[in-house]
From Swiss-Prot:
GO terms under cellular component: plasma membrane; proton-transporting ATP synthase complex
This protein's encoding gene: atpA
UniProtKB keywords: ATP synthesis, ATP-binding, Cell membrane, CF(1), Hydrogen ion transport, Ion transport, Membrane, Nucleotide-binding, Translocase, Transport
Entries under InterPro entries matching the protein: ATP_synth_asu-like_sf, ATP_synth_asu_C, ATP_synth_asu_C_sf, ATP_synth_F1_a_nt-bd_dom, ATP_synth_F1_asu, ATPase_a/bsu_AS, ATPase_F1/V1/A1_a/bsu_N, ATPase_F1/V1/A1_a/bsu_N_sf
Major localisation: membrane
Catalytic reaction annotation: ATP + H2O + 4 H(+)(in) = ADP + phosphate + 5 H(+)(out)
Gene source species: Clostridium botulinum (strain Langeland / NCTC 10281 / Type F)
Cited CDD domains: ATP-synt_F1_alpha_C (cd18113), ATP-synt_F1_alpha_N (cd18116), F1-ATPase_alpha_CD (cd01132)
Domain of life per record: Bacteria
Subcellular location: Cell membrane
The protein's name: ATP synthase subunit alpha
GO molecular function: ADP binding; ATP binding; proton-transporting ATP synthase activity, rotational mechanism
Summary of the function given for this chain in its UniProt record: Produces ATP from ADP in the presence of a proton gradient across the membrane. The alpha chain is a regulatory subunit.
Similarity section: Belongs to the ATPase alpha/beta chains family.
Complexes and interactors: F-type ATPases have 2 components, CF(1) - the catalytic core - and CF(0) - the membrane proton channel. CF(1) has five subunits: alpha(3), beta(3), gamma(1), delta(1), epsilon(1). CF(0) has three main subunits: a(1), b(2) and c(9-12). The alpha and beta chains form an alternating ring which encloses part of the gamma chain. CF(1) is attached to CF(0) by a central stalk formed by the gamma and epsilon chains, while a peripheral stalk is formed by the delta and b chains.
């Protein structure tokens, strides 16, 4: 085959012109040590803190320690099949989770992958797990109430939209029950709820999901689950992932409620990771930045300014204490970060007062501005009267003779305590809370036997719903008790009381 010299030059010129100079550069490193879900990698020169690192077998890791000669990574999956000498690659991305309406009603893990067997989550939007909190200019003050449906909380420790209210107490004192009732009470109120389970038993999470489904609450709820069998890095990521899912709705102008259950186990997971990464331990062996761990999470809860849509993210973090010790490291940290705390006591719980809220040391620092005026009117003296009752009850144990005024206060206190008892999964509409608290505070229950109070309460609501239906509507409409409404309430309660007392 004869090729002319000029043809050779044209072929060479053509090949030079078509030469593809696209060179793919991969920033890679080599595993020099692996074990306990932690990998030390040599290389990865320009790696970012918190960057996703691609390991063999489709496993990803997260770079947390950037040291002089290596990078410490935590694995977000199983370490089987990954060994020293394997090559890892940078992804140049940080950890993201899927967000959007498609997540509502689903149970997902810390990375947003569905674990409820209902197929993939069909959403195209992702959001970084770690996002800076809104600044001071981007926020507005908390002034709208978020009703929990629990009389003791809505009256004495009110929660507002955008607030962070800590639920703290020993194990088995009903902390999760309060959070669950609050989620159930948001039904029909256009509030998206997110329940983040950190380090819990799988059976417990399954039970919670089952209850939420049964009560119809999964229609507006996302469950993010990182159970005790998951690795420490996944437990560490869970609350941040849940928060990012909530922020998506907050920036769309919606109201969101998020429950972190619980941050004690979250701190333990972070301590595990930190010690394995050889970070220096501090008090109770927690690392020095354990305060920042929770503050950067809880500061993301806010009520956004009207310019940004006016959405809100309300947080209910849960912390477990040991033998009621609120002076331990994690409880004091979270108390100082949040806008108040609901303290649950095992003594009250075992004595049959449920929810076992200790009104003495429970407080809401910003929720008072959000409380509706009608509730303020009936609950204003409630905390003081309960405190005086407890003091008198302790004094009367010595068997000393009490004057008439003290006996009257004791009897009223017993009825107040009885009224504040409430069964689980029985949240109450705010207008009914106001009606029964009005009756209790204004001495309408003083001649009802204590053991008949619950029956009286139930039948009073039925009576008012039948004969005085407009009372509840008026309370919701005016949001305050006018003199006319008070006299109508007095008449309704007295009318029913006469019927009730004649039957017992």
């Amino acid at each position: 085959m004869n090729i002319k010299p000029e043809e050779i030059t044209s072929i060479i010129r053509q090949q030079i012109e078509n030469f593809n100079t696209n060179i793919e550069t991969i920033d890679s490193g080599t595993i020099i040590q692996i074990g306990d879900g932690i990998a030390r990698v040599y290389g990865l020169e320009d790696c970012m803190e918190g960057e996703l690192i691609e390991f063999p077998n489709d496993v990803y890791g997260m770079a947390l320690n950037l040291e002089q000669d290596n990078v410490g990574c935590v694995l977000l999956g199983a370490e089987e099949g990954i060994k020293e000498g394997n090559v890892v690659k940078r992804t140049k991305k940080v950890v993201e989770v899927p967000v959007g309406e498609a997540l509502v009603g689903r149970v997902v893990n810390s990375l947003g992958m569905p674990i409820d067997g209902k197929g993939p989550v069909l959403t195209t939007e992702n959001r970084d797990v770690e996002v800076p909190a809104p600044g001071v200019i981007d926020r507005q003050s908390v002034k709208e109430p978020l009703q929990t449906g629990i009389k003791a909380i809505d009256s004495m420790i009110p929660i507002g939209k955008g607030q962070r209210e800590l639920i703290i107490g020993d194990r088995q004192t009903g902390k999760t029950a309060i959070a669950m009732d609050t989620i159930l009470n948001q039904k029909g109120k256009d509030v998206i709820c997110i329940y983040v389970a950190i380090g819990q038993k799988q059976s417990t999470v399954a039970h919670i999901v089952n209850d939420l489904t049964k009560m119809g609450a999964m229609d507006y709820t996302i469950v993010v689950s990182s159970t005790a069998s998951d690795s420490a890095p996944l437990q560490y990521l869970a609350p941040y992932a849940g928060c990012s899912m909530g922020e998506y709705f907050m920036h769309k102008g919606k109201d969101v409620l998020i429950v972190y259950d619980d941050l004690s186990k979250h701190a333990v997971a972070y301590r595990t990771m930190s010690l394995l990464l050889r970070r220096p331990p501090g008090r109770e062996a927690y690392p020095g930045d354990v305060f920042y761990l929770h503050s950067r999470l809880l500061e993301r809860s806010a009520r956004l300014s009207e310019k940004l849509g006016g959405g809100s993210l309300t947080a209910l973090p849960i912390v477990e204490t040991l033998a009621g010790d609120v002076t331990a490291y994690i409880p004091t940290n979270v108390i100082s970060i949040t806008d108040g705390q609901i303290f649950l006591e095992s003594e009250l719980f075992n004595a049959g007062q449920r929810p076992a809220v200790n009104a003495g040391i429970s407080v809401s620092r910003v929720g008072g501005n959000a409380q509706i005026k009608a509730m303020k009117q009936v609950a204003g003296t409630l905390r003081l009267e309960l405190a005086q009752y407890r003091e008198l009850a302790a004094f009367s144990q010595f068997g000393s003779d009490l004057d008439k005024e003290s006996v009257k206060r004791l009897e009223k206190g017993k009825r107040l305590v009885e009224i504040l008892k409430q069964p689980q999964y029985g949240p109450m509409p705010v207008e009914k809370e106001i009606i029964i608290l009005y009756a209790a505070v204004n001495n309408h229950l003083i001649d009802i036997p204590v053991n008949k109070i619950k029956e009286f309460e139930k039948e009073l609501f039925n009576y008012i719903d039948t004969h005085y239906r407009d009372i509840g509507k008026d309370i919701l409409e005016h949001k305050q008790l006018t003199d006319e409404l008070k006299s109508k309430l007095d008449k309704a309660i007295n009318d029913f009381k006469n019927v009730f007392l004649s039957e017992i």
